[in-house]
Amino acid sequence: MGVSLEWFGDIARRLGITRPALYSYFADREDLQFRCYEDACQALERGLERAFAHHPGDMAGAVEEFLASRPEDGEQAVICELAALRDPQREEITARLGRMADRLSAALAAGIAAGTLRPMDCDIVASAIIGAASYAPLLRRWGGGLDSGLIAIGSVELIRRGMAADRRAEVETFRPLAPLSTPRPDAFDRAGLEQAKRERILVVASAMFNRRGVGATRLEDVGEALGMNKRAIYYYVGGKQTLVDACVERAYRYFLDVMHAAEGLTAPRCAVVHAAIKDVTSAAVDPGVSIILPYVGYGLLSEAAKASVADSARAMYDGYRDMIQQGVAEGSIRPLPVEAVTVSLPSLMSWSPIQIFTPETIALCAQELADLALWGILAR
């Protein structure tokens, strides 16, 4: 559901205790979220320490152990709603994540200097590794029955060596497969103007939901960011439930449009999957067209929207699985565990919405994550 939506009363009922009893352990919802994020940081830090200790000087081996490890204390929270924390708490969690990313980035840079790893943007790849290590609980929430246990296998395959069969070959590039832009109607086109305003609301709301979570984002917050009041949002879109459903429907329509466009290309499947990853990542991090990521807001969707998400998630899995299988058959993708890799593809960008990107770094992030899926970190 997301930390911001897990009200104290719901948690207390699940634990079989009273709500006042829960208040004896945590001051409020934000305190509970912070403590959960602290535990998650500790689990990631321990896993990273073990991986480096077991593989001194072997960054690829350390990354493999880090991604394949399981938390010792059960499922941890996924740190994906940082903006919902109070400022001091957010700064502390951000600093801890930053230190882990810095350590991974430095180790990646050392591997590049030693010639064991390929050139890459070490900061982006380090963040992607941390995101992939946290992805399994997210998939269990929204994946429509997909096997989250395959994440450790698939993420190791992708991040260590990537999908490409020929690691020396360059990959074909394409125009955006399914361009996503805010419409610019004629000034006298009333229906077009209303549609453009609705689209702009969905873009801004999606970006805020990605960064803050749905529960911590009010309609008033969205309106303030747009310079309009809550009544205008009701007029163009509807209430919060309708807004969340509309953001998710827009995202999945885009995901499926990209996939279908990729399926129709007459090009090696490795290049096609590379292009699709690049486009979806760019849309997720570009504030001008922002799409809500699959796992965000799932707990607040209507039952009809949840069913639609499950169907879309399964359709996306089937489509990308088939493209990867075709790539293996044609020889552009190496033999690999297709199901595990397909399930793991979204994990590479699961961290990205909590970052702030400039126009220059949007393209760099999209390119780096697509390259990571194709070639991994090992030297080419």
Predicted regions and their residues:
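Generic hydrophobic, amphipathic alpha-helix propensity
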Residues: 1, 11, 36-40, 44, ...
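DNA major-groove recognition helix of helix-turn-helix
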Residues: 26, 37, 133, 237, ...
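C-terminal peripheral helix-coil segments that are non-catalytic and often amphipathic
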Residues: 102, 106-113, 138, 142-203, ...
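Amphipathic alpha-helical packing segments from all-alpha helical-bundle domains
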Residues: 88-114, 123-127, 134, 304-330, ...
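Helix-turn-helix
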Residues: 1-31, 200, 204, 208-242, ...
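Hydrophobic alpha-helical connector segments
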Residues: 35, 46-75, 125, 129, ...
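Amphipathic alpha-helical segments used for helix-helix packing
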Residues: 61-64, 68-91, 105, 284-304, ...
